[in-house]
Amino acid sequence: MSDHPNNYPKLHNAAWPGLVGKGDGGEPPIDLDTMLDLTAAAEVDGVKFDGFDIFLYHPHFNIDGGDEETKRLAEKARARNLQVGTVVVPGYPGTGGGLPMGGKADQEKFLGQVHKTCHVARKLRELGVRPHGVVRIDSVCSVEAWSEDPKGNQKRIADTFREACKIAEDHGERLAAEGEICWGGMHSWRRMVELLEMVDCRETLGFQADMSHTLLFLMGYNAPEDALLPQDFDWNDHERFDEAYAKLTTALRPWTIDFHVAQNDGTVYGSGSHDKTGRHCLATDPKGKLDIPHHAGFWLRDESGRLTKAFRHLCWDGCMFPNATLRKRDTWNDILGAMVGVRDAHGWKG
């Protein structure tokens, strides 16, 4: 442990790789107990995961299960000496939610799921297992559908998110929107900033930065007009890459209140019911375009190099891997090792 003196930010795993891209004709989901056991078993130089983030949806969680369901989740965490961090709203159509840019019925479904999730989040705090973390939301619409009326749809999403902020404030929570190339209105760095500014609830709504998804922002995959790198970019030109990455993070870092350590090989991928989005790679993938500790620093430090300390935990995100890979202990040790490297470089003692 003396080689890794920093204890903040706390290091979390994500439980949802056992769900995202699973089912719907693909591989079956991996149950929550298995994901938590794998998380608790990982260890690097005496360092272990401190907690996990979770998507509050079947089969990992029943959002309509009442406080008893929340108590069961708290018990699962406590039994493994893990904390709960950020919780993800099941706001998608098909998970009980609706489109934020849709009509009144859709918006009410979405906001209803936000309310349920914020209640669970607050209860987990009261139960003593969730000292940090936010509530994550998405626009949950395709870029194609959003593009039919960009101005009108962006306004409706902003209006719905503003109402979601009121719900979060009533529960003592903050919301974070995760920009991904597959979510309309949040599919480029410029549109993401635009949406956050339109909502104009900076104290309550922020950005969740995922290192994999934001890499695709640089490439302008679904928004070529917002690309910061050309299509024929030479990935060996590290200086030019870092210049573009600095521009990206300068725009989004002031909004960032939640962070995903991740790797990407510069391509997109989708499986199961999940649309194509930035391909998550394993932490040790030789095709990965990111120097994880180096590029994490663009998010965790300001332009002068000072730590922002804008969030108290980091979460790994790596989805749509084969179940056989997810069940290997070495997978999680490698991931934890990458996260320890980030904390060694950009963490602090607290």
Where are these regions (language model features)?
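A cross-domain feature marking catalytic cores of carbohydrate-active enzymes
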Residues: 11-15, 51-58, 84-91, 137-141, ...
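Glycine/Thr-rich phosphate-binding loops of Rossmann-like dinucleotide-binding domains
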Residues: 62, 145, 269
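A short helix->loop->beta-strand "cap" motif at the edges of active sites that frequently abuts
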Residues: 82, 130-131, 173, 305-312
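N-terminal pre-domain/capping segments
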Residues: 1-131, 162, 169, 243, ...
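Active-site groove signature of glycoside hydrolases
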Residues: 118-150, 171-182, 315-316
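Active-site cleft segment of glycoside hydrolase catalytic domains centered on the general acid/base Glu
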Residues: 143-161, 167-168
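Surface-exposed cleft-lining segments at the edges of enzyme active sites
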Residues: 102-105, 142-152, 177-184, 226-237, ...
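Histidine-acidic metal/acid-base catalytic patches
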Residues: 1-44, 126, 158-159, 186-350
